[in-house]
Amino acid sequence: MKILIVVDMQNDFITGALGSAEAQAVVPKVKGYIEQWLEEKKGSLYFTRDTHHDNYAETQEGRNLPVLHCVEGSDGWEICRELQEYTLDVPVFDKPTFGCQDLAEYLQETEGQPDEIVLIGLCTDICVISNAMLLKAFFPETVITVVEKCCAGVTPESHKRALEAMQVCQIQVV
């Protein structure tokens, strides 16, 4: 069985407080990948959503990245309009930090030992790598794959470095 996880495709990472041209460019690629995944019935689909609150500045992340973003209930917190239809019937995991331990535990309980977990989304160098590494730890015998063309980092350089780091840790980059 295969699982596709769409990481943090939220307005604040695309056009908002932490948006970039690279993130905007991957939206149609992510949409196409999801459509193909569903059309070919490859497996389960999940989304993650970075979720913060008004006390963000008081958190460790907020002290290190002092840009208020993805505040629950705000437009920036929402999954981008182009992908919202795909979230209607699948689990969306709100996460207060880079990696989503709740998602990993849920997959362990409901999916057993997947053959492959595929990750796409934002940001390669923060939340994609964090979730890929977390899932590799939870599922050491599962192939973890990151689709390069469907990810963007904070910068093109940090995107590339994150992909290289994941490859060193036996995460497939395709």
Feature map (PLM): residue ranges:
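Active-site acidic carboxylates
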Residues: 1-92, 145, 154, 159-168, ...
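Internal catalytic-core helix/loop-beta-alpha segment
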Residues: 73-126
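A general structural motif
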Residues: 1, 42, 113-117, 141
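Histidine-anchored nucleotide/phosphate-binding helix
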Residues: 31-37, 129-139
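Short strand-loop junctions, especially beta-strand C-caps/beta-turns
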Residues: 16-18, 96, 122, 149
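Phosphate/ribose-phosphate-bearing ligand recognition and processing surfaces
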Residues: 121-130, 139, 145-156
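Short, glycine/serine-rich, charged loops/turns that create anion-binding
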Residues: 10-11, 52, 97, 124-126, ...
